[in-house]
Amino acid sequence: MSWGETFGCKGNAQCGWTSVKDLTSFSFSEGNCPTYGKDNFQLKAEGYIDATGNLVAAHDAATAHLGAPWRMPTTAEFEALINNCTETWTQRNGVNGRLMTGRGAYASNSIFLPAVVGGSTSQYPRNLCGLYWSSTPASDYSTDAGTLNLYYYFQVGRSDRYDGQVVRPVR
């Protein structure tokens, strides 16, 4: 789904991407992403982000679908995950991904992140990488939002807000 949207999209083998909202042919683009090109001041003024600089519940896909306290993680939480875990490329139930295992005070925690990418990121090989939205817009680019990138590298990055990335809810 595009960043700041809550209705989502699903794959359709015959016609590409189909919007769940209206079930018509759909393509991720700048024109159909309401947050694209808006700086943080505009996002805050229009009610997309709060005083902390993260998506409000009404525009948080995890909260919209699962209810509170579920939400999208922030880029700071993605950075903490990277800094406090070891990561191992593995497979669970036939799905490739990264197993994040906590270190130190977090040693009893782990999370599996499937290697999945969204709609407009066809340059990344399926089943070999993952791109997950954060709730944080990129502060230096009014067209981007923060992501957790799982590819040859494992890092916090950014992606065009209209890209169809996936959401990994947290609480």
PLM ranges: what are they?
Residues 1-171:
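Conserved positions within compact, well-structured domain cores
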